[in-house]
């Protein structure tokens, strides 16, 4: 069982996360359903954020002459970067001494109820782990995203659903499983099964015969009508698989001119076979795309009748942004602020 000191460290980390969420108004209004802008939260907390090609370190919290800073490695996927950022932010918020972290913070559970799964670590590390998990994946965010996507607890028995949820949350697959287990969305036994799945295999299953060159760095976003209004913060090499129901029997087709105009290259475009015995059912348009340039702004796709494009079109609106955390240097908004002041 988790000892008292371990439990106290976990609770202290959670309290720190709740306090910062409250102070930054992350737990009210529309913010409750949005992935946490952890890089922005670091800046709002008064620390300088820097990206550097660290190896083997994932990140570090430093403090010199009263000035706080956080350094993150550019050599990790976005989900890992974000968890590391939240972990280092936890060190800052909880008043810890400067510290550097390696991949050990990704392998251990932030909490658990059996001692075999909770390796003993210093109290400050346990606090920062708990802070990071709760800050990036608070109960209200999980609940809001489940409602938006139409996910029920039984859907998370499928590793594919957990992987797609991790992209919406902006966390690693493993961190997402721990948070779902923490909130009793999945049980302990199922959580162990889910952790045995490999995200790289889930990505390849989505892509079928399309060759994925870098399974560690590239994520595959599976987008459907359920993603209406979603904020998509992707890495520059990510792929986007759109599977959209198409009422072709009534003459409706999805148009993707907007996708091209926004800077996407369409890699595959086709329709899935209609299941036997379902003649007249909507077909599923299947499009695989990749962003050729950084994204930033609203993208609206339309399902229309070509001869009457303004006649009751079906819309899918996404808000797309390319993460720049793979570039070395000062966090972009802080760099722009310094340039404006000079």
What kind of feature is each model-predicted range?
Residues 1-288, 295-342:
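Active-site hotspot residues in diverse enzymes, especially metal/ion-binding acidic/histidine motifs
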């Amino acid at each position: 069982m988790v000892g008292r000191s371990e439990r106290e460290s976990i609770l202290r980390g959670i309290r720190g996360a709740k306090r910062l969420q409250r102070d930054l108004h992350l737990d009210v209004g529309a913010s409750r359903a949005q992935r946490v802008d952890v890089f922005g939260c670091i800046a709002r907390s008064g620390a300088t954020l820097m990206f550097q090609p660290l190896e083997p370190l994932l990140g570090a919290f430093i403090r010199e002459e009263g000035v706080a800073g956080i350094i993150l490695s550019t050599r990790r996927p976005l989900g890992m970067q974000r968890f590391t950022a939240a972990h280092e932010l936890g060190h800052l918020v909880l008043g810890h001494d400067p510290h550097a972290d390696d991949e050990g913070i990704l392998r251990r559970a932030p909490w658990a109820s059996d001692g075999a799964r909770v390796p003993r670590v210093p109290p400050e590390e346990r606090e920062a782990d708990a802070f990071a998990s709760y800050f990036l994946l608070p109960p209200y965010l999980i609940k809001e995203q489940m409602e938006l996507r139409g996910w029920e607890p039984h859907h998370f028995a499928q590793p594919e659903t957990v992987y797609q949820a991790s992209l919406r949350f902006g966390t690693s697959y493993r961190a997402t499983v721990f948070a779902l287990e923490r909130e009793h969305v999945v049980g302990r036994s199922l959580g162990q099964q889910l952790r045995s799945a490999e995200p790289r295999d889930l990505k390849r299953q989505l892509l079928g015969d399309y060759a994925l060159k870098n399974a560690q760095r590239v994520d595959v976003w599976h987008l459907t009508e359920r993603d209406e209004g979603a904020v998509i913060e992707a890495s520059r090499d990510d792929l986007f698989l759109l599977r959209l129901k198409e009422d072709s029997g009534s003459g409706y087709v999805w148009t993707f001119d907007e996708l091209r105009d926004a800077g996407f290259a369409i890699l595959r475009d086709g329709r899935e076979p209609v299941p036997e015995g379902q003649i007249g059912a909507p077909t599923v348009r299947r499009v695989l795309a990749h962003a050729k340039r950084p994204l930033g702004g609203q993208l609206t796709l339309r399902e229309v009748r070509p001869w009457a494009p303004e006649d009751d079109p079906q819309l899918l609106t996404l808000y797309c942004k390319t993460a720049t955390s793979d570039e070395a240097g000062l966090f972009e908004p802080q760099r722009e602020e310094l340039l404006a002041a000079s």
